[in-house]
Amino acid sequence: MSREVFDQIAESWYRVRHWPRLRSELEELAQRWRSGRLLNVGCAHGADFLPFKGGFELWGVDFSGEMLKQAQRFSAKLQFKANLVMADAVSLPFGNETFDYAVAVASYHHIKGKQERETALQELKRVLKPGGEAFLTVWNWGQPRFWLRYKEARVPWRVGGKIVYRYYHLFSYGEFEKLLVKVGFEIVSISPEKSYRFPVKNFSRNICALVKKQ
Protein backbone atom coordinates (compact mmCIF):
# COMPACT_ATOMS: atom_id res chain seq x y z
CA MET A 1 0.00 0.00 0.00
CA SER A 2 1.39 3.36 -1.03
CA ARG A 3 2.10 5.77 1.81
CA GLU A 4 1.57 8.58 -0.69
CA VAL A 5 -2.04 7.51 -1.28
CA PHE A 6 -2.91 7.73 2.41
CA ASP A 7 -1.08 11.04 2.69
CA GLN A 8 -3.29 12.33 -0.13
CA ILE A 9 -6.59 11.18 1.39
CA ALA A 10 -5.87 12.07 5.04
CA GLU A 11 -7.70 15.41 5.07
CA SER A 12 -10.85 14.05 3.42
CA TRP A 13 -10.70 10.92 5.59
CA TYR A 14 -10.78 13.12 8.69
CA ARG A 15 -13.80 15.04 7.40
CA VAL A 16 -16.01 11.99 6.83
CA ARG A 17 -14.99 9.59 9.65
CA HIS A 18 -15.57 11.16 13.02
CA TRP A 19 -16.68 8.00 14.84
CA PRO A 20 -15.26 4.48 15.15
CA ARG A 21 -16.23 2.27 12.24
CA LEU A 22 -17.05 -0.62 14.61
CA ARG A 23 -18.17 1.40 17.59
CA SER A 24 -20.21 -1.24 19.45
CA GLU A 25 -17.40 -3.81 19.18
CA LEU A 26 -14.81 -1.37 20.50
CA GLU A 27 -17.05 -0.19 23.34
CA GLU A 28 -17.50 -3.82 24.43
CA LEU A 29 -13.73 -4.30 24.38
CA ALA A 30 -13.22 -1.19 26.51
CA GLN A 31 -15.53 -2.75 29.09
CA ARG A 32 -13.80 -6.12 28.81
CA TRP A 33 -10.27 -4.74 29.12
CA ARG A 34 -10.98 -1.90 31.60
CA SER A 35 -7.51 -0.32 31.60
CA GLY A 36 -3.94 -0.78 30.42
CA ARG A 37 -1.51 0.22 27.69
CA LEU A 38 -3.22 -0.06 24.30
CA LEU A 39 -1.68 0.02 20.82
CA ASN A 40 -3.71 1.04 17.76
CA VAL A 41 -2.00 -0.33 14.63
CA GLY A 42 -2.84 1.70 11.53
CA CYS A 43 -4.57 4.29 13.68
CA ALA A 44 -5.25 6.72 10.79
CA HIS A 45 -6.92 9.86 12.19
CA GLY A 46 -7.59 8.25 15.56
CA ALA A 47 -11.36 7.73 15.71
CA ASP A 48 -10.94 4.18 17.02
CA PHE A 49 -9.27 5.56 20.16
CA LEU A 50 -12.55 7.09 21.37
CA PRO A 51 -14.00 4.12 23.31
CA PHE A 52 -10.66 3.74 25.14
CA LYS A 53 -9.95 7.35 26.07
CA GLY A 54 -10.79 6.75 29.74
CA GLY A 55 -8.51 4.41 31.70
CA PHE A 56 -6.09 3.46 28.92
CA GLU A 57 -2.64 4.69 27.96
CA LEU A 58 -3.11 5.16 24.22
CA TRP A 59 -0.47 4.57 21.56
CA GLY A 60 -0.98 4.74 17.81
CA VAL A 61 1.19 3.89 14.83
CA ASP A 62 0.59 4.72 11.20
CA PHE A 63 2.93 4.89 8.22
CA SER A 64 1.25 8.06 6.92
CA GLY A 65 2.57 11.27 8.39
CA GLU A 66 -0.47 13.16 7.12
CA MET A 67 -2.82 10.72 8.85
CA LEU A 68 -0.93 11.25 12.10
CA LYS A 69 -1.39 15.01 11.71
CA GLN A 70 -5.13 14.40 11.48
CA ALA A 71 -4.92 12.14 14.56
CA GLN A 72 -3.29 14.99 16.48
CA ARG A 73 -6.06 17.29 15.31
CA PHE A 74 -8.75 14.76 16.25
CA SER A 75 -7.37 14.01 19.72
CA ALA A 76 -7.10 17.73 20.50
CA LYS A 77 -10.68 18.30 19.38
CA LEU A 78 -12.04 15.37 21.42
CA GLN A 79 -9.74 16.12 24.36
CA PHE A 80 -7.81 12.92 24.83
CA LYS A 81 -4.11 12.11 24.79
CA ALA A 82 -2.61 9.62 22.34
CA ASN A 83 1.08 8.93 21.81
CA LEU A 84 1.49 8.86 18.03
CA VAL A 85 4.41 7.27 16.21
CA MET A 86 5.12 7.14 12.48
CA ALA A 87 6.02 3.52 11.77
CA ASP A 88 5.23 0.55 9.56
CA ALA A 89 3.30 -2.42 10.97
CA VAL A 90 5.99 -4.81 9.71
CA SER A 91 8.59 -3.20 11.99
CA LEU A 92 7.05 -1.81 15.17
CA PRO A 93 9.43 0.46 17.13
CA PHE A 94 8.63 -1.00 20.54
CA GLY A 95 10.25 -3.51 22.84
CA ASN A 96 8.99 -7.02 23.47
CA GLU A 97 5.90 -7.34 25.66
CA THR A 98 5.16 -3.60 25.78
CA PHE A 99 1.37 -3.54 25.42
CA ASP A 100 -1.54 -5.07 27.32
CA TYR A 101 -3.94 -4.80 24.39
CA ALA A 102 -4.09 -3.82 20.73
CA VAL A 103 -6.63 -2.94 18.07
CA ALA A 104 -6.14 -2.88 14.32
CA VAL A 105 -9.34 -1.94 12.53
CA ALA A 106 -9.10 -2.31 8.75
CA SER A 107 -5.29 -2.22 8.77
CA TYR A 108 -3.71 -5.55 7.83
CA HIS A 109 -5.64 -5.91 4.56
CA HIS A 110 -3.69 -2.89 3.25
CA ILE A 111 -0.37 -4.74 3.54
CA LYS A 112 0.82 -6.06 0.20
CA GLY A 113 2.50 -9.45 0.18
CA LYS A 114 1.74 -12.69 2.02
CA GLN A 115 5.04 -12.72 3.92
CA GLU A 116 4.69 -9.05 4.84
CA ARG A 117 1.23 -9.66 6.34
CA GLU A 118 2.58 -12.57 8.36
CA THR A 119 5.55 -10.48 9.52
CA ALA A 120 3.25 -7.66 10.63
CA LEU A 121 1.18 -10.05 12.74
CA GLN A 122 4.34 -11.54 14.23
CA GLU A 123 5.38 -8.02 15.19
CA LEU A 124 2.03 -7.45 16.87
CA LYS A 125 2.40 -10.67 18.83
CA ARG A 126 5.93 -9.69 19.83
CA VAL A 127 4.92 -6.37 21.39
CA LEU A 128 1.94 -7.82 23.28
CA LYS A 129 2.41 -9.02 26.83
CA PRO A 130 1.67 -12.69 27.59
CA GLY A 131 -2.08 -12.99 28.03
CA GLY A 132 -2.62 -9.79 26.06
CA GLU A 133 -5.49 -9.59 23.60
CA ALA A 134 -5.85 -7.91 20.21
CA PHE A 135 -8.91 -7.08 18.13
CA LEU A 136 -8.25 -7.26 14.39
CA THR A 137 -10.56 -6.63 11.45
CA VAL A 138 -10.07 -7.15 7.72
CA TRP A 139 -12.35 -6.97 4.72
CA ASN A 140 -14.06 -10.17 3.69
CA TRP A 141 -13.60 -11.44 0.14
CA GLY A 142 -17.10 -12.96 0.30
CA GLN A 143 -18.98 -9.67 0.58
CA PRO A 144 -21.24 -9.27 -2.48
CA ARG A 145 -19.49 -6.26 -4.02
CA PHE A 146 -16.31 -8.34 -4.45
CA TRP A 147 -17.83 -11.52 -5.89
CA LEU A 148 -16.33 -10.88 -9.32
CA ARG A 149 -13.02 -9.49 -8.03
CA TYR A 150 -9.65 -11.06 -7.43
CA LYS A 151 -8.42 -11.14 -3.83
CA GLU A 152 -5.98 -8.32 -4.61
CA ALA A 153 -8.20 -5.27 -5.13
CA ARG A 154 -7.77 -1.58 -5.81
CA VAL A 155 -10.57 0.41 -4.17
CA PRO A 156 -11.17 4.03 -5.24
CA TRP A 157 -11.34 7.15 -3.06
CA ARG A 158 -12.19 10.56 -4.48
CA VAL A 159 -10.03 13.45 -3.31
CA GLY A 160 -9.50 16.90 -4.77
CA GLY A 161 -11.46 16.14 -7.93
CA LYS A 162 -9.47 13.00 -8.75
CA ILE A 163 -9.60 9.31 -7.94
CA VAL A 164 -6.84 7.53 -6.04
CA TYR A 165 -6.75 3.80 -5.38
CA ARG A 166 -6.12 1.99 -2.11
CA TYR A 167 -4.69 -1.53 -2.13
CA TYR A 168 -6.67 -4.27 -0.35
CA HIS A 169 -5.96 -7.94 0.16
CA LEU A 170 -9.41 -9.49 0.60
CA PHE A 171 -9.40 -12.32 3.14
CA SER A 172 -11.65 -15.34 3.44
CA TYR A 173 -12.60 -16.46 6.94
CA GLY A 174 -10.51 -19.60 6.53
CA GLU A 175 -7.45 -17.76 5.27
CA PHE A 176 -7.49 -15.21 8.09
CA GLU A 177 -8.00 -17.83 10.77
CA LYS A 178 -5.20 -19.99 9.35
CA LEU A 179 -2.81 -17.02 9.30
CA LEU A 180 -3.58 -16.07 12.90
CA VAL A 181 -2.98 -19.64 14.06
CA LYS A 182 0.26 -19.86 12.06
CA VAL A 183 1.59 -16.75 13.78
CA GLY A 184 0.82 -18.34 17.13
CA PHE A 185 -2.26 -16.50 18.37
CA GLU A 186 -5.03 -18.20 20.28
CA ILE A 187 -8.31 -17.27 18.60
CA VAL A 188 -10.88 -16.20 21.19
CA SER A 189 -13.53 -15.43 18.58
CA ILE A 190 -13.86 -14.78 14.86
CA SER A 191 -17.12 -13.45 13.45
CA PRO A 192 -18.82 -10.80 11.29
CA GLU A 193 -19.37 -7.26 12.53
CA LYS A 194 -22.27 -6.91 14.99
CA SER A 195 -24.37 -4.90 12.53
CA TYR A 196 -24.42 -7.87 10.11
CA ARG A 197 -27.77 -9.67 10.34
CA PHE A 198 -27.68 -12.27 7.55
CA PRO A 199 -27.56 -15.85 8.93
CA VAL A 200 -24.60 -16.89 6.73
CA LYS A 201 -21.41 -15.21 7.95
CA ASN A 202 -19.56 -15.64 4.63
CA PHE A 203 -21.15 -12.52 3.11
CA SER A 204 -20.25 -10.05 5.87
CA ARG A 205 -18.28 -6.90 5.07
CA ASN A 206 -15.76 -7.44 7.87
CA ILE A 207 -14.03 -10.37 9.52
CA CYS A 208 -13.54 -9.50 13.19
CA ALA A 209 -11.09 -11.54 15.27
CA LEU A 210 -10.30 -11.33 18.96
CA VAL A 211 -7.00 -13.08 19.59
CA LYS A 212 -4.81 -13.75 22.61
CA LYS A 213 -1.08 -14.14 23.07
CA GLN A 214 -0.33 -17.28 25.06
Set out the residue ranges of the language-model regions.
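Class I (Rossmann-like) S-adenosyl-L-methionine-dependent methyltransferase catalytic domain
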Residues: M1-S35, L39, A44-S91, Q115, ...
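Active-site phosphate/pyrophosphate-handling residues
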Residues: E4, A106, T119
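Short, amphipathic alpha-helix enriched in basic
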Residues: R73-A76, D100, A104
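A short acidic, Gly/Pro-enriched loop at the edge of an enzyme's catalytic core
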Residues: V90-A102
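Conserved strand-to-helix beginnings and helix N-cap segments that scaffold or border functional pockets
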Residues: N96, K114-E118
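A short SAM/SAH-binding and catalytic strip from SAM-dependent methyltransferases
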Residues: Y101-Q115
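A short glycine-rich, Lys/Arg-flanked "PGG" loop and its adjoining helix->strand segment in the class I
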Residues: E118-P130
